[in-house]
Swiss-Prot record:
SUPFAM superfamilies: ITPase-like. Nucleoside triphosphate pyrophosphatase. May have a dual role in cell division arrest and in preventing the incorporation of modified nucleotides into cellular nucleic acids. GO terms for cellular component: cytoplasm. Belongs to the Maf family. The active site is at D72 (proton acceptor). Keywords: Cytoplasm, Hydrolase, Nucleotide metabolism. It catalyses: a ribonucleoside 5'-triphosphate + H2O = a ribonucleoside 5'-phosphate + diphosphate + H(+); a 2'-deoxyribonucleoside 5'-triphosphate + H2O = a 2'-deoxyribonucleoside 5'-phosphate + diphosphate + H(+). This is Nucleoside triphosphate pyrophosphatase. GO terms for molecular function: nucleoside triphosphate diphosphatase activity.
Length: 198
């Protein structure tokens, strides 16, 4: 039995590897925009969980004996969900809006094991620094935040511009280890079953 990650996110992979798990990488290709449009007006946690579920469900038939994990993160700022900025210009715009403020990073998780299903969202408050314009522009030019929810990373260059977080750090990076542990326990599995042999 293996843990299969329905994502090509380097951050999610690094969380699992750092926690002793060498997952199978099986990126799911889903129409995220269509799901977001279908759920327009829904609660933020419902949206990120639906996106996580779509990813896990897309690949689960190929891994019937394994545990499949899907995840999706978005930043909630001023009542609006912010996904990935995709461009340096959008990154700079996002940072001007969130610098010096607090926002909520919501990560949806969907964990599948055979016919069993565990879905949970985790919420972490992120306090953004009042970064200088020069640093915001330089950060955007690196390309690092372009494919990250909220236009930042906690574990790399973006860490310079985060004053503090309240909640689970692994959730901010892309997958909550406490949520995954609860999912595995709900299936009658132990975390240590997935640790790579040393």
């Amino acid at each position: 039995m293996r843990l299969v990650l329905a994502s090509q996110s380097p951050s999610r992979l690094s969380i699992l590897r750092g926690a002793g798990v060498e997952p199978v990488i099986a990126p799911a290709h889903v129409d995220e925009r269509a799901i977001e449009e279908r759920l327009a007006g829904a609660e933020p946690a419902e949206i990120v969980c639906a996106l996580a579920a779509a990813k896990a469900e897309a690949i689960a038939p190929d891994y019937p004996e394994d545990v499949v994990v899907g995840g999706d993160s978005m930043l909630l700022l001023d009542g609006s969900l912010q996904g990935k900025p995709h461009t340096p210009e959008a990154t700079v715009e996002r940072w001007h809006a969130q610098a010096g403020r607090a926002a909520e990073l919501i990560t949806g998780h969907c964990v599948l094991y055979g016919e069993e299903r565990f879905v949970e969202a985790s919420r972490t408050t992120v306090h953004f620094a009042q970064a200088s314009d020069a640093d915001i522009e330089a950060y955007a030019r690196t390309g690092e935040p372009l494919e990250c929810a909220g236009a930042f990373t906690l574990e790399a260059l973006g860490g310079w511009f985060i004053d503090r977080i309240e909640g689970d750090p692994s959730s901010v990076i892309g997958l909550s280890l406490p949520v995954l542990r609860r999912a595995l326990y709900s299936f009658g599995l132990n975390v240590s079953e997935f640790w790579a042999q040393h």
